[in-house]
């Protein structure tokens, strides 16, 4: 009965052009009320409050703050200069610089969003100016920023460690080698694509 009601409510909401996320939320709330009454609201509030009181979660806003401070202080440009000295001489150097800088920035901020915000506004226009296609520049920037999920200190790793009751330190150690390997293969792919297209 509950499943049939959920399905019907979702179809009705979607047919009257309610956004999918809101439709799913309303459907879920109706199903919870049908199944348990309104007591789930109190339980949900308690669980959310208890979940927010975990000590490792304090690191998340601090990593975001550190990334914001570094961006406003101009550290992004210094990281780009350092990466340029390391890999800028290779064919497709600007895409290599993009990937290396994203890896360095991921090691500092732990956030893929902060990585894209700090480096994308600098590197994408620079890559376009050097003749890289805009889609390629955006793809390199976004894919290299996704390494921040793997390279420690990673915000998703902290959240996972809290939820799974795992060791944050062990997860960070486990992310080093895959992050470096992922960065290497991204650089290899960027090099091959640069040979073909640029």
Regions found by a protein language model. Give the residues of each.
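Alpha-helical transmembrane segments of multi-pass membrane transport proteins
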Residues: 1-196
């Amino acid at each position: 009965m509950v499943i049939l009601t959920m399905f019907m409510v979702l179809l009705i909401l979607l047919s009257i052009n309610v956004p999918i996320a809101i439709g799913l939320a309303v459907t879920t709330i109706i199903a919870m009320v049908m199944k348990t009454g309104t007591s789930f609201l109190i339980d949900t509030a308690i669980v959310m409050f208890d979940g927010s009181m975990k000590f490792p979660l304090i690191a998340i806003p601090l990593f975001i703050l550190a990334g914001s401070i570094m961006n406003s202080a101009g550290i992004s440009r210094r990281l780009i200069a350092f990466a340029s000295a390391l890999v800028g001489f290779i064919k497709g150097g600007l895409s290599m610089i993009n990937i290396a800088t994203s890896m360095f920035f991921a090691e500092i901020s732990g956030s893929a969003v902060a990585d894209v915000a700090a480096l994308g506004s600098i590197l994408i226009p620079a890559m376009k100016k050097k003749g890289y296609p805009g889609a390629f520049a955006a793809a390199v920037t976004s894919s290299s920023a996704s390494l921040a999920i793997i390279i420690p200190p990673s915000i998703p790793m902290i959240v996972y460690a809290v939820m799974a009751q795992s060791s944050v330190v062990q997860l960070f150690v486990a992310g080093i080698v895959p992050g470096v390997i992922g960065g290497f293969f991204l650089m290899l792919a960027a090099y091959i694509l640069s040979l073909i297209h640029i």
